[in-house]
Regions:
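A cross-kingdom feature that marks ATP-driven nucleic-acid transaction machinery
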Residues: 195-366
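Phosphate-binding site recognition
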Residues: 1-227
Length: 366
């Protein structure tokens, strides 16, 4: 095994050609595993047609972050605790190893992330440096998204560059799975004018939401104030991760009596009419957390609401969801399966499909 292969190539650029000669001669009598943390460099070495090792790999393995359910199986934590911890540490094993060195979440966060000397205090910069030396636009884009700017035009305005100038950087961030594009359910991802860009990695999402804006306070040792702000808004952040986990748990899965296609978020404006009027009097903003079409019956749609908060009455949540669906164009003429994805058991039960943290973790892809 040759680990961190791109760095070896930097030291000796002839190394790929040497390996090519051995492979092509048929003299290779063992399996050779080439590893590297730089996605860009590894792809260039293996996938670039001008490189010596192009076409020589018998298998290409992209090691993805470990999914949330495996941390649940491995650690002595409840499903709810795993999702809360996962919303910060994500799926990178090293982060969890570091986290386990501390008895509490606050201690881990303060020492690893908020302390300027912490092991993860500058982790995003280190990740970007694995792929490029020009990390400034990467940091600027991630900072803009982390502060709530999701449209590319708005991100470009905040960063101070044209969209065309930032497009290659955004493309790389998406390829590295640090950012993902979202379009409303039912819209073409390539043609939609409603595309949003969101941070796709839980740790980076947390970092750019809470840590980067807090740097002025951290620089004057106001860590207690920063921690309190994190506590005050943590449920909202976990709720964002929870929503994504719920979408993934439904996608391609047989739940609630149907196998569902890829689930997505939906948002948009819908016209509001007064009784007897043919023209709308106003527009209403609508948003649905989980929407998916049945693969068994195209006339059936799942519409779900995700809640990461204290227990509520299921009847009230269902009634609110049903009221919103009345205005949704994608639901016209469809059979609707209503679902609630809840952190806690509701205060009262109603005739509605429900999933809780244990159910969502069990239904994530293996």
């Amino acid at each position: 095994m040759l680990d961190e292969f791109p760095y070896l190539v930097e030291r000796d650029p002839s190394l790929p050609s040497v390996i090519q000669s051995i492979v092509d001669s048929g003299a290779m009598r063992y399996n050779l595993l080439i590893c590297g943390s730089s996605q860009r460099m590894m792809q260039k070495i293996v996938l670039d047609g001008s490189e010596p090792l192009y076409g020589r790999a018998s298998e290409k393995i992209n090691l993805s972050p470990i999914r949330a359910q495996y941390w649940w199986h491995a650690l002595n934590l409840s499903a709810k605790q795993v999702i809360e911890e996962y919303s910060v540490w994500g799926g990178v094993p090293r982060y969890w190893v570091l986290r386990e060195q501390y008895s509490s979440f606050d201690d881990a966060l303060e020492n690893l992330v908020l302390d300027e000397h912490g092991a993860l205090a500058e982790e995003p910069e280190a990740l970007f440096l694995d792929d490029t030396n020009a990390i400034a636009p990467y940091i600027s884009i991630m900072t803009a998204i982390g502060q709530g700017n999701a449209k590319f035009s708005r991100i470009a305005d905040v960063v101070g560059h044209k969209v065309s100038e930032l497009a290659p950087v955004m493309k790389n961030l998406i390829a590295m799975h640090y950012v993902r594009k979202e379009v409303p359910f039912g819209e073409d991802a390539e043609k939609s004018k409603k595309t949003l860009y969101v941070i796709d990695d839980p740790f980076l999402d947390f970092y750019y939401r809470f840590v980067v804006p807090a740097r002025p306070l951290l620089s004057i040792d106001r860590t207690d104030v920063v921690l309190q702000n994190i506590h005050d808004h943590m449920a909202e952040h976990v709720g964002h991760i929870w929503e994504r986990l719920c979408q993934i748990a439904v996608s391609g899965n047989n739940v609630f009596g149907h196998t569902w296609n890829v689930a997505a978020h939906w948002w948009g404006k819908v016209p509001v009419f007064k009784e007897g009027k043919k023209t709308p009097v106003s527009n209403r903003e609508l948003e649905f957390d989980v929407v998916a079409e049945s693969m068994d019956d195209k006339d059936t749609i799942l519409v779900g609401e995700c809640k990461w908060k204290s227990a509520d009455h299921a009847e009230r949540l269902l009634a609110q969801l049903q009221e919103k669906v009345k205005y949704a164009s994608f639901a016209k003429g469809k059979k609707i399966v209503y679902a609630l994805f809840l952190r806690e058991q509701p205060l009262s039960i109603t005739d509605c499909k429900m999933m809780f943290p244990e159910d969502v973790l069990k239904n994530l892809p293996k």
